[in-house]
């Protein structure tokens, strides 16, 4: 579905939300969901009248299998360049293991991951904080993983991966305790995001936060009062 002009959330993708941006200097994809989503994503691109061979980048907000699962499949089909933050690059390329999630969900991930059919891929582009790619700025937001990022256009849009949650009605929520490698760092990252200005927040899971999204995030943080318990640190 088209969320706003030239920004699509691809319907039916298993796993994390998968976004396609068709405007700007290059067409690009943000995250791919679980393994075996490749044909579904390609068919969506064709259905909206775009050519999959015009896909220039597949940008990973971080390295969990529900975000990177179909990267290798899509790279083979499209030859798009794969981009991920330097801290998560080893996981994508198979040189390091997926992050450890706490609790029963973590055990399920550990047992199921070998059966999911993930194929490692060496990234073409290593992302760093404040880099520009495809008309967006990379914002380093560690905590969920060590290499989590957001993609940001000032005053317009932010793709935030799993830096925070969103419910089915598009209300922002705090990061998951069990799914964050470092919850304190994750909270710092959300505070940093709240200092940016954007109208739409596009999460890795949940519904888009539309219309004054940065103000809604500030309102959420005002209730939580994290600034009092978590001192800011440089990323």
Regions inferred by a protein language model and the residue ranges of each:
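Core dinuclear metal-dependent hydrolase active-site scaffold
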Residues: 20, 126-153
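Active-site HxH/HxHxD metal-binding segment of metal-dependent hydrolases
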Residues: 36-38, 46-125, 222, 226-227
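Glycine-rich phosphate-binding loop signature in dinucleotide/nucleotide-binding domains
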Residues: 48-53, 131-134, 195-196
């Amino acid at each position: 579905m088209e969320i706003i002009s030239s920004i699509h959330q691809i319907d039916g993708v298993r796993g994390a939300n998968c976004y396609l941006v068709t405007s700007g200097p290059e067409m690009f994809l943000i995250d791919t969901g679980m393994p075996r989503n490749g044909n579904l994503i390609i068919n969506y691109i064709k259905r909206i009248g775009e050519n999959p061979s015009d896909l220039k980048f597949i940008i990973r907000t971080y390295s969990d299998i529900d975000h990177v699962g179909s990267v290798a499949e899509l790279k083979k089909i499209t030859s798009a360049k794969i981009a991920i933050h330097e801290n998560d690059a080893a996981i994508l390329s198979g040189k390091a293991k997926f992050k450890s999630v706490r609790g029963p969900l973590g055990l399920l991930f550990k047992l199921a991951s070998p059966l999911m059919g993930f194929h490692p891929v060496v990234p073409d582009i290593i992302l760093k904080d404040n880099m520009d790619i495809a008309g967006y700025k990379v914002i380093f937001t560690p905590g969920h993983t060590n290499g989590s990022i957001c993609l940001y256009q000032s005053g317009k849009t932010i793709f935030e991966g799993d830096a925070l949650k969103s419910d089915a009605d598009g209300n922002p929520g705090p990061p998951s305790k069990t799914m964050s490698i470092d919850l304190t760092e994750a909270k710092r990252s959300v505070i940093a995001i709240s200092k940016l200005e954007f109208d739409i927040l596009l999460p890795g899971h949940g519904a888009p936060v539309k219309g004054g999204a940065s103000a809604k995030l500030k309102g959420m943080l005002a209730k939580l009062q994290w600034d009092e318990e978590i001192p800011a640190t440089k990323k």
